[in-house]
């Protein structure tokens, strides 16, 4: 049987960036890793309804900077920034260093593998037919410009006695092309029949130029020059 390598892991440092970017010596490494895990665990649980795609953690000069990628930034920020301030205090307590929280909006949630998987599990938990949920996710992604998408669900589908796996694919999903920008993520639906696993692969196109092309910042908008009165 052909086994699949993790699509994100194989592309790290080629076209994918790490979710935690920091350096530490041997003594500090384990503590940093443990606090990263606890921060992610806390934020994922606290922001379960905020459509969080990914959490990026950086550690500049004895502090921690957390960037939350979400499709619903208003829920994370709260009224006048109250909620995000509460989160910042808890993150600072967990990490033991001053914390800063940034919010990044996911503009197209239909093209984000984690949000697509979460959308499918919420439908499965509401007893929507799994084929309908899969097909809807695939159609939405292709309509918004995905080059290809594959969705796989496994478990006691439709309450069947024997668990099975079903998948649906549209377009191209090249798993071996390292320069391919493939967004992959998983999620679990907890139904009355048991747990149903959902996997989503979304192919967004090829990235030429490696990490330099990925990390290149967008050019800032230049202010328009104002014409002086009386001059043409």
Curated annotation (Swiss-Prot):
Q: What does this protein do?
A: Binds the lower part of the 30S subunit head. Binds mRNA in the 70S ribosome, positioning it for translation.
HAMAP family (UniProt xref): Ribosomal_uS3_B
What is the designated name of this protein?
A: Small ribosomal subunit protein uS3
What GO biological process, any one, is recorded here? translation
Q: Name one Pfam family in it.
A: KH_2
Gene transcribed to yield this protein: rpsC
NCBIfam families given for it? rpsC_bact
Q: Listed GO molecular functions?
A: mRNA binding; rRNA binding; structural constituent of ribosome
- GO cellular component term of the entry, any: cytosolic small ribosomal subunit
Family named by the database record: Belongs to the universal ribosomal protein uS3 family.
Organism listed in the record: Yersinia pestis bv. Antiqua (strain Antiqua)
Q: Where is the KH type-2 domain?
A: 39-107
Superkingdom is Bacteria
Give the quaternary structure.
Part of the 30S ribosomal subunit. Forms a tight complex with proteins S10 and S14.
- Decide whether keyword RNA-binding is in the record: yes
The entry's keywords:
Ribonucleoprotein, Ribosomal protein, RNA-binding, rRNA-binding
Xref: InterPro entries: KH_dom (IPR004087), KH_dom-like_a/b (IPR015946), KH_dom_type_2 (IPR004044), KH_sf_prok-type (IPR009019), Ribosomal_S3_C_sf (IPR036419), Ribosomal_uS3_bac-typ (IPR005704), Ribosomal_uS3_C (IPR001351), Ribosomal_uS3_CS (IPR018280)
């Amino acid at each position: 049987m052909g086994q699949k390598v993790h699509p994100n892991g194989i592309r790290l440092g080629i076209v994918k960036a790490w979710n935690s970017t920091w350096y530490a010596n041997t003594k500090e490494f384990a503590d940093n890793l443990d606090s990263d895990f606890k921060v992610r665990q806390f934020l994922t649980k606290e922001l379960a309804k905020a459509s969080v795609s990914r959490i990026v953690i950086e550690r500049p000069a004895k502090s921690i900077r957390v960037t939350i990628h979400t499709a619903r930034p208003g829920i994370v920020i709260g009224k006048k920034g109250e909620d995000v301030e509460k989160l910042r205090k808890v993150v600072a307590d967990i990490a033991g260093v001053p914390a800063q929280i940034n919010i990044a909006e996911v503009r197209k949630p239909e093209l984000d593998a984690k949000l697509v998987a979460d959308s499918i599990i919420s439908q499965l938990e509401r007893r929507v037919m799994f084929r309908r949920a899969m097909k809807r996710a695939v159609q939405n992604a292709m309509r918004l410009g995905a080059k290809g998408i594959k969705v796989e669900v496994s478990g006691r589908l439709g309450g069947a006695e024997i668990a099975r796996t079903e998948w649906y694919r549209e377009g191209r999903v090249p798993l071996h092309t390292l320069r391919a920008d493939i967004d992959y993520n998983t999620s679990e639906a907890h139904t009355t029949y048991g747990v149903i696993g959902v996997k989503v692969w979304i192919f967004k196109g090829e990235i030429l130029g490696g990490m330099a092309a990925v990390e290149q910042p967008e050019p800032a908008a230049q202010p328009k020059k104002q014409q002086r009165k009386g001059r043409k």
